[in-house]
Amino acid sequence: ENPDESVTEGDLKNANNGDEYYQGRVLRKNGYEYGTPTGRARRCGWFDAVAGRYSITINGLDAIIITKLDVLTGLKKIKVCIGYTHNGQSIKDFTNDIKILSECKPVYEEFDGWEEEIRNVKSYHGLPKNAQNYLRRLGEILSVPIYIASVGAERDETIILDERFG
């Protein structure tokens, strides 16, 4: 399998290539990340909070939904891209300058993973502590609350984190 093969083109700052190529394959396998019409493998990477904050801002979002939390089950460590470096300079905000973006390296915050199966979990407090910590910190990094988290592929494998949606 070619680590550069992808269903879509474009710059993925946190694609798990090189030293993290194996990790990207695990995420792809666990998340069934293959193109529907072609069956080609999609590139997978850690959550990019820089791009996430930018998306939240330009779309005027006041809350988000996290999907595929179950894909992270079994990983010893989980990373979130919290910034970039470019020519030794720290970048905290997303840039739409394609040249600069293509030269950036991700800066990660690392979390402990969890081993417990979460697909049957129905509440935030039923999640493993490390999964709770991950969701809590994502909300802090993104500066918006997470209202819903999916813990599996089925409709009922969803946790409502905000009572307004319960």
Where in this protein do the model-derived segments appear?
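Non-transmembrane, aqueous-exposed alpha-helical and coiled segments at domain scale
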Residues: 1-166
